[in-house]
Amino acid sequence: AKRDAAKCDAAKCDAERIRMQNLVDWMKRRMDKCLPGMMISLSIQFFTLPLVAYYYYEIPVYAILLNIPVLALIPYVLGLAVFGSLTGQIAFLQPLSFALCRVCGWVLHGYRWLCDASLLLPGARMITGKPSEVRVVVYYGLLGAFYYVLWCGMKKKQRQMCTKGAQAEKQEWIRRRFGFGLGLVLVLLLTFLFVRGKPEFELDILDVGQGDAIYLCASDGTNFMIDGGSTDVKKVGTYRILPFLKAKAIRKVDYWFVSHTDEDHISGLVEVMESGYAVGTLVLAEAQKEDEKAYRLAELAQKNGIRVCYMKAGDVLGTRKEDVVNERNRAETFRIECLYPTNNNDSEDVNDRCLVLYYEDENFSAFFGGDISSEVEEQLVSAGKCRQTDVLKASHHGSKYSNSDVLLHALHPRLTIASAGKKNRYGHPSPEAIARVGESGSTFYSTIDYGRIRVRFVDGEMVAEPYRKCL
């Protein structure tokens, strides 16, 4: 009885092993049939990836998987479409033509639905930044070399295989070589397209027309934005601010400061938050906490998982003293101090309740005054809060009622940069303000003439790099 039971168990094990082997064989046959489609899909992705990254600054992560069913269905869809077009020329076959074309439409709409649905999945887009032309050329050269070597190997292997099992052996050889080559190409892709060096200090005054949008990369790599809006550039967040951030491969803005809630300072920020782009903390002036616009902005931020905090005069954001452990680390320290307003400021003019910020690190300093008037500027100077500055972001877009002599002489900026729109109705930047800046010895730049203006250090020297030359 025991021997019979043992034989029965052995038979069951053999049957189970056979079933598993059949399943494995079936899966291998399926993989062999899918392999050509997967190779074509991967080849298309590898070929188009640099161009997509170069022009859109991000890549769709799930595109490779989505292309597999498309490649499988395309021959049938094209065949049905051609046959439907031909039958449509014959009167009594037009109902058939309509039905065939309707089926093709369903397939295409289904694929579009899959594409839209894939973008809702976590990690659907990967921000890569804009690769340099050199990296793109090197990438294509290496990719071409890889495919040439693979093609030569396949031809050689094909000549060697003359036995009955040649086709299966060829499939196995392709699978192994393509898998190895795929890994190699991925390494090259990461190396030549997406690997970037350590972030360096950079200040950018974006060209957003009649508005403000300022990007600041601190000396330790922390990403800041100050304001983000416009009254004359439509969809400024979608078509100016987000493309700028993505082109620089910035996947998250750590802190987004809002000087005040006028449309020319927040319209783009609202679009950015609604798009789902990652923002760590939204920073508002505590004196504006009860304003309706500020309340709605904070509510939108919290709805999108963004932390909201409020600053008042005397608050400081930056590197803690205990975090400074050596001289190398000291060079990466920074501080952003709120100079104005106090938490009990009750000025009726929202411009005079603007968040005024002063950035400072080992080599650079900048003053950001929002839209404050000359009266507030004089208050800050009288309180001893203004000291020598490398860059002054011109207050109120270069208005003649701001950027006073008192402030300019206290800050003594090397550069003064105004953000304004062409032919704006306010006359910004005003000739009076430009004249005062010139008299103070500061070099004046305007986004009207120069477009985006970048300030960075080259060989230890601060330089201003306008996007275009002044005509």
Regions found by a protein language model. Give the residues of each.
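Non-globular, low-confidence helical/coil segments that flank catalytic cores
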Residues: 2-22, 67, 86-471
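Membrane-embedded alpha-helical bundles of multi-pass enzymes
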Residues: 1-4, 17-82, 124-128
